[in-house]
Amino acid sequence: MKRFDYEFPVRIHFGQGCFEDSLKKELQKYGKRVMLAYGGGSLKRTGLYDRIVAMLNEAGKTVTDFGGIMPNPTLKKVQEGQLLARETKADLILAVGGGSVSDCCKIVSAQARLDSDIWDYEYAERKIPTDFIPLGVIVTASGTGSEQNNGAVITNEEKKLKSPLWGCFADFAILDPDLTKTVPMKQVISGAFDTLSHCMETYFGHPHTCNLSDRINEAVQRSVIKNLKALIANPDDDFARSELMWASAMGENGILKLGKVTDFQCHMIEHQLGAYTDCNHGQGLAVLHPILYRHIYKSAEEKFRRWAQEVWLVQDADEGIDFLADLIREVGLPTTFTEMCISLDDDIIRAIAESTVITPGCCKQLTADEIVEILNECK
């Protein structure tokens, strides 16, 4: 895919090799104080950290590190980041990594400009922040599409809730497929399934009559499936990396959701699973999706049949679900909680089910008892 720039509303720089030129241009637009945010040690091990710091120094920036952002970022980590941003009077937060780093920084950007706790501000006062520290994102692990929107998933450890919060849209995001070579293939596979999940969750939202958004969605799903297999077969396949990275962006930039009502119920169940187990997000979705779909597909059998025909090239709805399960096994994702090394007793399963928030949007509104049944089948 050719390099391009795009704004909707995040300013996107996309393409193989675009990283350095794009970052140099963007750094000219912001003040001297940059808070550099990242996750674990891979950024430094691969040398990308040193490259970015050198570019920041060359641009005359003062750099403050905010590292150690975990895969399921916590409210405590958000508060740590916002204190650092305030103390250093950051002019720009530069988030480097995958969805967890981006999610954390979107909320740090908002919390640093709020006097009250952002969790209470959004959930108790029912308000949405409007003032932010500018944010730039350099994507190294695609899949979540987090750089495309202002939503974030944050774990409140005290309340045992992993829930959406609303922060800033990034001012800019750099999507260079070459940078995904800095993360392990296991993470690439998990991220690609998260992309597929975003597309499926949107696709099965109301209305169930096929529209242009759904037709585009079908094409994105087919692309994810094809290019994930291609990349596993050949990790040097730059075209497949590019396609997966742009599919990730398409899954969450809002285009597929136009004209749709969605509840993302599989995500909401997995979020609470993550709140109690700190499990890998993409792997949790892989275990849940086929079992959940077998529970709900008869409530929208015609839509599931179309999905089977257009995405999986088979005739019947249940065949499509079987093919989804086959893909999960083929790419090496887990199919049970046991394979994820997760053990859930009845009390935890009930707690996950009771704390999962599902709003109307999908073809079947799940009850807590149905979620318990699904979780038990996932063991």
Regions found by a protein language model. Give the residues of each.
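Active-site segments that bind and position negatively charged phosphate/pyrophosphate groups
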Residues: 202, 206-323
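C-terminal charged capping/lid subdomain of soluble metabolic enzymes
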Residues: 304, 314-379
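Glycine/serine-rich anion-binding loops at beta->alpha junctions
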Residues: 90-106, 140-146, 276-279
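Short glycine/serine/threonine-rich phosphate/pyrophosphate-binding segments
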Residues: 19-23, 45-48, 75-78, 100-106, ...
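ATP/NTP phosphate-donor binding region
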Residues: 1-92, 337
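Short Gly/Thr/Asp-enriched flexible loops that form oxyanion-binding sites at enzyme active sites
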Residues: 52, 82, 101-115, 148-151
